[in-house]
């Protein structure tokens, strides 16, 4: 009941309505929190909710995340398919909690996000493959080779998808062992491969006294699924490695497996969840775009009719001091993709992904250094860097590019420029000269990294070139690299 007074009765009534509105908002907020709390206490949901909050805490401490285009994801939809450019291994883990808490920790989004990962992530020894070139101790690598991530990634709503490029001979032998049993190697591998294993075993025994080789024709599948035989089995599967019967079985098995995996992804969308998938099928190793995989068209055909398809891209600003920045950009929904021919579908998706690249100091600075090297002018000062970056920003702003937050302010830009130079000096990208001059070290641009390849400045240059091509010429201008 509202009480009014003779003096100031109108203001008192407005104040009463304001208090009532605040109370209703608080009650609505508490109802939302109670609903989420009850939902997240369920056994199947608790692990997902708990890990997402751990990831969110990690990002708050070590990564400064910026969200662009959150209004495209916020409205409810029957189902949402996120087509995301893939830059780092942790892209889906960063994307999920940021969109879940896009309106703040007290107003979580009730939608769950599933993501698609490479199939070998669900096999034993995947972690050993990831850290293979990190020069870890041998005992640690042996321990990782025995671990299986399936109990961890399954509660996070991870779904496998098979790709021939990542299917090794060892993966096939795991599949054979699970489906056909412990067969003799002679019934699986070709004579060429058996001879190769014998030669490798002899050479290894000459270097390692503990290794006791046995003729490969006396071994069974389980005998070589150990750490000792891991090295020769990690090469990509080839037809000549198998006997004809096993290769025919492998082809039929892959077709049935991929069909079942696509059906599982379609079921995720039919449940109304959000699905994260990389249309290029892998992490881009050079910053350029690769062709869209055919499975995207098949997945769109299985999705519900009103599925919302959103292009997403994450741009990392890591050439700085302090915390790395991650710019998560969500684009407007893509309509009518299921009706397009494959070539047109690929061009439209790649163009939409390229438009979501956010301009960062890392991209601008890398572009400047690369152009100076191409011009044969490796020496520069801070004023030259500042002038070139400001000019490039002006052109990109006119074309409608998005910039990371604060970069267009003069004071912030100067601070980012100094942080970029400091990073370059620490990482060996720049060499300090007398008189506040700097020289570009060309070696980091020429190195081919097997791990952490995204640290190469050419990676960042290719990202910016992809954005510029999309802004300038449209869909047909974006050159793709064969995947």
Question: What residues fall within each predicted segment?
Answer:
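A basic- and aromatic-enriched beta-loop-alpha substructure that forms the phosphate/nucleotide-
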Residues: 125-188
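A transmembrane-helix-recognition feature enriched in membrane-embedded lipid enzymes
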Residues: 5, 9-69, 94-97, 108-111, ...
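Acidic/glycine-enriched edge-of-secondary-structure segments
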Residues: 50-58, 85, 246-253
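A short, aliphatic-rich alpha-helical micro-motif
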Residues: 75-76, 153, 269
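Conserved H-X4-D acyltransferase segment
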Residues: 55-133, 178, 183-212
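Short aromatic/hydrophobic-glycine micro-motifs
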Residues: 63-64, 157-158, 377, 429-430
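Short glycine-/polar-rich loops that comprise or flank the Walker A/P-loop
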Residues: 109-113, 155-157, 273, 305-308
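Non-catalytic C-terminal accessory region of glycerolipid acyltransferases
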Residues: 2-39, 163, 169-483
